[in-house]
Structures are given as C-alpha cells and as structure tokens.
Regions:
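Bacterial N-terminal signal peptides that target proteins for export
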Residues: 2-12
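Intrinsically disordered, low-complexity serine/threonine-rich segments
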Residues: 7-9, 22-25
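Bacterial N-terminal signal peptides
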Residues: 11-20
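Cell-wall polysaccharide-cleaving catalytic domain and substrate-binding groove, primarily
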Residues: 26-242
Length: 242
C-alpha cells in the first residue's frame, strides 16, 4: 500500500482510539450510576477520529483546574493579590475563577509579563518559568497530607520540555525559537501560536485523566479552548487599564 501508516503512527492512532473509547465508556457508566456530570463550557477534548467535542467531567473526581475553572493551573500574581475575576485560591496558591475566560485572560497577561520583563520568548523559556520542575496543578490524585509543597500530585507532574516540544512542533518551530507572541506594546502578534501555547498548557495541566496526551513525536494536542472563550478572554484583557 503506497501510503500505508508507519508502525508508530498506527500505534498512536490505536492509543488515541482506546483513550476516547475508555473515556466514553466511563462517561456512560457515570451517567448510569447517577453521578453528577458537568460540561466545561468552552473546553473541547479530542476524540478518536480527530474531531473535538465538549469536555464532560464528574466534579467529585475531576482535577482542581476543571472544578475551579482554572484549566491552565495559574497561580495568583503574588502571595496576597488576585487576578481579575479570581475568587480565591487553594493552599498551594492555584487560583479559583467563576469564569474560565478570566483564567485564560490572566494567562495571556502573564505571558506578556514573561516576555516584557524576563525576555522569555521561546516555548522552552516560557514553560520552564511557568511550570518549574516538580510543580503540578494540584489534581486530586494524592491526599493533601501526602502532597509535597507546591502541589505534588503523581498524575500530573509538569514536564516543561515535553510541553515546549508539543507547542513548537504544532506551530512548525523549534522549542528554542522565538514565538514572537507580542509586540512592544503588548499587542498579540501571532494568535495562532498563543492559542497553541494555551492549548498545550491546558492539555498538560488538566492531565491525562481528561485530556489525551499525544505520544512523543506527534503534533496534535488533546484539549483546546474554543473560539468563543478565547475571544472573550482577549476582550477581557483589552478592557483592563494599563
């Protein structure tokens, strides 16, 4: 067959199909058991055939980010401050929002701060700062007493180099290349690259329990923010003074 899939590609396709099938079965079983199911409005999850559908979750079993509209696992801007729209934080500083658009808005602002103040311009530099080794989003995979300072959850260890590779590959750059996300006044230069960065971070921080993780070498991303929510986040950002 002239255009036959490579063994690695077939394996990746099978893995994604199995993930989607198991997720669908879990969702069906939860519904049959009468478990409460919520839809993460504005968050889409990749299906086995490559399409995207709204992400549905059980709030009693979901990671912190889904339960608290903080899909990017952003922390408060400092020890006592709050981002616009932030309603609180957990003991590790991860923010809670009533509206996920505010979390995405805050993430975009933070990316601009990284570029403007710290000259973090590549996927590698950005994610090493945003996701330091050993940190995590606080997903409930370990009881609080067993989590180390800063999060400490097994299922969702941050892996900045892997996430940086996913971002770079998805936009056709190397992990150390300048993403050129913002102009000198903070205007967004490349919305496609910024959105890929957001989606890769969401995929990593929400975790494999709800977002399929692409195998090494693959350029697809498991969860993405839909157009409406992204546009609302940008609008919220442009309304802010300064």
């Amino acid at each position: 067959m002239k255009h036959s899939l490579s063994q690695a590609t077939r394996a990746a396709a099978v893995a994604l199909t199995l993930f989607s099938a198991s997720a669908a079965l879990a969702q069906r079983d939860a519904a049959m058991a009468g478990e409460e199911q919520h839809t993460a409005s504005g968050l889409l999850v990749r299906q086995g055939e490559g399409s995207f559908a709204p992400l549905v979750f059980d709030p009693d079993k979901a990671p912190f980010g889904l339960r608290n509209n903080n899909w990017v696992a952003i922390k408060g801007p400092n020890l006592s401050g709050k981002w616009p729209g932030q309603t609180g934080a957990n003991t590790h500083g991860f923010a809670r929002f009533d509206d996920p658009a505010y979390a995405i808005r805050s993430f975009i602002e933070l990316m601009w701060i990284y570029q403007d103040r710290h000259n973090a311009r590549s996927a590698t530099d950005i994610l090493k700062r945003y996701s330091p080794a050993g940190d995590c989003s606080g997903a409930p995979s370990l009881p609080p007493r067993e989590r180390r300072e800063g999060g400490g959850c097994i299922e969702n260890q941050t892996t900045a180099p892997i996430t940086a590779m996913r971002v770079a590959r998805a936009v056709g750059l190397r992990p150390t290349d300048n993403l050129d996300l913002f102009g000198p006044d903070g205007q967004i230069n490349h919305p496609d690259r910024l959105r890929t960065l957001i989606d890769a971070v969401v995929t990593q921080e929400v975790g494999a329990s709800h977002c399929p993780q692409p195998p090494r070498g693959e350029s697809w991303i498991g969860c993405r923010v839909d157009d409406g929510l992204y546009n609302r986040a940008v609008e919220l950002l442009t309304r802010m003074p300064g």
